[in-house]
Amino acid sequence: TGTSCISPKQCTEPCRAKGCKHGKCMNRKCHCMLCL
């Protein structure tokens, strides 16, 4: 269910949309962290 990504910046918006403050890119997928 992760958004595909190349850089962590691409994960910021989709993660914020999920209520998360931070996202990083691993294995070309976004992993959201610091979620409510």
Swiss-Prot record:
Tissue expression per record: Expressed by the venom gland.
Alphabetical list of InterPro entries matching this protein: Scorpion_toxin-like_sf, Scorpion_toxinS_K_inh
Compartments reported by the entry: Secreted
S-S bonds: 5-25, 11-30, 15-32, 20-35
Pfam families (UniProt xref): Toxin_2
PROSITE patterns xref list: SCORP_SHORT_TOXIN
GO MF terms, alphabetically ordered: ion channel inhibitor activity; potassium channel regulator activity; toxin activity
One CC-aspect GO term: extracellular region
The keyword Magnesium belongs to this UniProt entry's keyword annotation: no
Main location: secreted
Keyword line: Disulfide bond, Ion channel impairing toxin, Neurotoxin, Potassium channel impairing toxin, Secreted, Toxin
Annotated function: Blocks Shaker B channels expressed in Sf9 cells, with a dissociation constant of 52 nM.
Similarity section: Belongs to the short scorpion toxin superfamily. Potassium channel inhibitor family. Alpha-KTx 06 subfamily.
UniProt note: domains: Has the structural arrangement of an alpha-helix connected to antiparallel beta-sheets by disulfide bonds (CS-alpha/beta).
The protein, known as: Potassium channel toxin alpha-KTx 6.14
Organism: Hoffmannihadrurus gertschi (Scorpion)
Lineage start: Eukaryota, Metazoa, Ecdysozoa, Arthropoda, Chelicerata
